[in-house]
Curated annotation (Swiss-Prot):
Transmembrane segments: none annotated. This is NAD(P)H-quinone oxidoreductase subunit M. It is found in: Cellular thylakoid membrane. Its EC number is 7.1.1.-. It comes from Prochlorococcus marinus (strain MIT 9301). One of its GO terms (molecular function) is quinone binding. One of its GO terms (cellular component) is plasma membrane-derived thylakoid membrane. The keyword Plastid does not apply. The lineage of its organism: Bacteria, Bacillati, Cyanobacteriota, Cyanophyceae, Synechococcales. It is a peripheral membrane protein. It catalyses: a plastoquinone + NADH + (n+1) H(+)(in) = a plastoquinol + NAD(+) + n H(+)(out); a plastoquinone + NADPH + (n+1) H(+)(in) = a plastoquinol + NADP(+) + n H(+)(out). Belongs to the complex I NdhM subunit family. It comes from the Bacteria. NDH-1 shuttles electrons from an unknown electron donor, via FMN and iron-sulfur (Fe-S) centers, to quinones in the respiratory and/or the photosynthetic chain. The immediate electron acceptor for the enzyme in this species is believed to be plastoquinone. Couples the redox reaction to proton translocation, and thus conserves the redox energy in a proton gradient. Cyanobacterial NDH-1 also plays a role in inorganic carbon-concentration.
């Protein structure tokens, strides 16, 4: 029986047991693809993207040899969400004012008026 593509979806993180081939997701049992901030809610800089990628790669290495089931994918997604919130709270990431919907899903931005 052929395995199905698994995915874990949070508001800002989507993880698939797949690789991108010709701009399409193709199931791959040994690869994960990260779709970060699909709604463009944040403004990303190179440093914050590198931190996310390092964390993602580290979480994958921690799970080497384990089955990547729905539960493990959700745990990875939750940890990435936590890092996004940390980066936002520490000013290393900011909301995108041109986002389709401005809902401050990770809390209100820290400004001098709020502090």
């Amino acid at each position: 029986m052929e395995k199905m593509l698994l995915k874990s979806t949070t508001r800002h993180v989507r993880i698939f047991t797949a690789e991108v081939v010709d701009e399409e997701l193709k199931f791959h049992p040994n690869k994960l693809t990260l779709d970060l901030d699909p709604d463009n809610e944040f403004i990303w800089n190179e440093d914050s993207l590198n931190k996310i990628n390092e964390k993602f790669n580290g979480l994958i290495k921690e799970r080497a040899g384990k089955d990547l089931d729905d539960y493990e994918l959700r745990k990875i997604g939750s940890e990435i969400e936590g890092l996004i919130k940390f980066l936002l709270q520490n000013g290393q990431l900011s909301y995108n004012p041109d986002c389709r919907v401005m809902n401050y899903s990770m809390g209100l931005p820290m400004t001098n008026e709020v502090l």
